[in-house]
């Protein structure tokens, strides 16, 4: 990896993750110069020369999504006009990923629109953590690496000397649950929460598919938003005989705060990655634990710069378990 020809930037909302990545790579983190004008418009640029350099931007289009998206687009445009050789975005959270299809007539496909905007701005490659729907990769005409956070999160359970069942919170997450179960051990069973959606951000839990009686349960999801559905699922698992219940997710949005989890007696812990900066919440709440993506993402950056396979990182991880 030619560090002299590589430069890493952090968008304002991902500074902690970006610094951790740079610490892993033993590289300097460069900040983005941002100006907010009186009318609300923004200007973002680099103080560093980027001409003929491979640029990596650590970003997240989490809340406030629209502001963070616009910041990223403007900064990418500035780098393109400054003659950067390549512009690679490490997008820890892909906003609008849940708007990946027309659920009803006259609705937009915002996930596709965002993909178009990122490409027009000038991005060469995107590395994204756990897309809500892997098919979103098909919205791009540039290389996309969809990093599976299960490999990072599973380490929290491979080191524990206890038996547990991996639980998918719905039928759509069965593959995600199966992948995590197989990463941990071939002996780990899975169960599925049977539920139906009754309105936006609201679902009704019908029951559990699989035996959870007298088992520790680990509910695995990609996104935790309001938290109501997850808490309901935990309550159903407890009624069906589950012992300790852990919640594991790639992205902790927590749009209604964390009290709903901290106050839920049926939930023992909530583990999320730092794809979204929740460190202040973790200082306040005992049940919240954050796992850093930095060790894994730093290896991804190194593989890209050395023209090596990103898939090999997964293989080496499994070999080192």
Swiss-Prot record:
Binding, ATP: 39-41, 98-99
Compartments it resides in: Cytoplasm
Pathway of action: Metabolic intermediate biosynthesis; 5-phospho-alpha-D-ribose 1-diphosphate biosynthesis; 5-phospho-alpha-D-ribose 1-diphosphate from D-ribose 5-phosphate (route I): step 1/1
Cofactor remark from the record: Binds 2 Mg(2+) ions per subunit.
Keyword Transferase included in the entry's annotation: yes
UniProt cross-references to Pfam families, sorted A to Z: Pribosyl_synth (PF14572), Pribosyltran_N (PF13793)
Domain of life, per lineage: Bacteria
GO cellular component, one term: cytoplasm
Active site: 195
Positions of D-ribose 5-phosphate binding: 197, 221, 225-229
EC number from the UniProt entry: 2.7.6.1
Residues the record lists as binding Mg(2+) 1: 132
Protein residues bound to Mg(2+) 2: 170
Gene Ontology terms, MF aspect: ATP binding; kinase activity; magnesium ion binding; ribose phosphate diphosphokinase activity
Catalysed transformations (reactions): D-ribose 5-phosphate + ATP = 5-phospho-alpha-D-ribose 1-diphosphate + AMP + H(+)
A GO biological process held by the record: 5-phosphoribose 1-diphosphate biosynthetic process
Cofactor: Mg(2+)
Keywords per UniProt: ATP-binding, Cytoplasm, Kinase, Magnesium, Metal-binding, Nucleotide biosynthesis, Nucleotide-binding, Transferase
Entry keyword Transferase: yes
Quaternary data: Homohexamer.
NCBIfam families reported in the protein's UniProt record: PRK01259.1 (NF002320), ribP_PPkin (TIGR01251)
Function noted in UniProt: Involved in the biosynthesis of the central metabolite phospho-alpha-D-ribosyl-1-pyrophosphate (PRPP) via the transfer of pyrophosphoryl group from ATP to 1-hydroxyl of ribose-5-phosphate (Rib-5-P).
Family under the similarity heading: Belongs to the ribose-phosphate pyrophosphokinase family. Class I subfamily.
UniProt-recorded name of the protein: Ribose-phosphate pyrophosphokinase
Annotated source species: Mycoplasmopsis pulmonis (strain UAB CTIP)
């Amino acid at each position: 990896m030619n560090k002299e020809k590589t430069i890493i930037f952090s968008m304002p909302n991902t500074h902690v993750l970006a610094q951790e990545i740079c610490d892993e790579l033993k590289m300097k983190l460069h900040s983005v110069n941002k100006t907010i004008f009186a009318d609300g418009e923004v200007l973002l640029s680099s103080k560093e020369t980027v001409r003929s350099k491979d640029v990596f931007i650590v970003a997240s289009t989490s809340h406030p999504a629209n502001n963070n998206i616009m910041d990223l687009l403007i900064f990418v445009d500035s780098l393109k006009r400054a003659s950067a050789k390549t512009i690679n975005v490490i997008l820890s959270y892909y906003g609008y990923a849940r708007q990946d299809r027309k659920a009803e007539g006259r609705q937009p496909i915002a996930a596709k629109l965002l993909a178009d905007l990122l490409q027009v701005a000038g991005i060469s490659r995107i590395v994204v953590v756990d897309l809500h729907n892997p098919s979103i990769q098909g919205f791009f005409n540039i290389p996309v690496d969809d990093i599976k956070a299960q490999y990072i999160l599973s380490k929290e359970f491979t080191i524990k000397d206890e038996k547990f069942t991996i639980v998918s919170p719905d039928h759509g997450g069965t593959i995600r649950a199966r992948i995590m179960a197989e990463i941990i051990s071939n002996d780990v069973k899975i169960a599925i929460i049977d539920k139906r959606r009754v309105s936006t951000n609201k679902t009704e839990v019908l029951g559990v598919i699989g035996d959870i009686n007298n088992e520790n349960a680990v509910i695995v999801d990609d996104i935790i938003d309001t938290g109501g559905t997850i808490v309901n699922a935990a309550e159903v698992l407890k009624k069906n005989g589950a012992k300790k219940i852990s919640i594991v997710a790639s992205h902790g949005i927590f749009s209604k705060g964390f009290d709903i989890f901290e106050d839920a007696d049926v939930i023992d812990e909530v583990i999320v990655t730092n794809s979204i900066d929740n460190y202040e919440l973790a200082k306040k709440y005992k049940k919240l634990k954050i796992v850093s993506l930095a060790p894994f993402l730093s290896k991804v950056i190194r593989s890209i710069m050395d023209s090596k396979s990103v898939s090999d990182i997964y293989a080496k991880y499994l070999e080192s378990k």
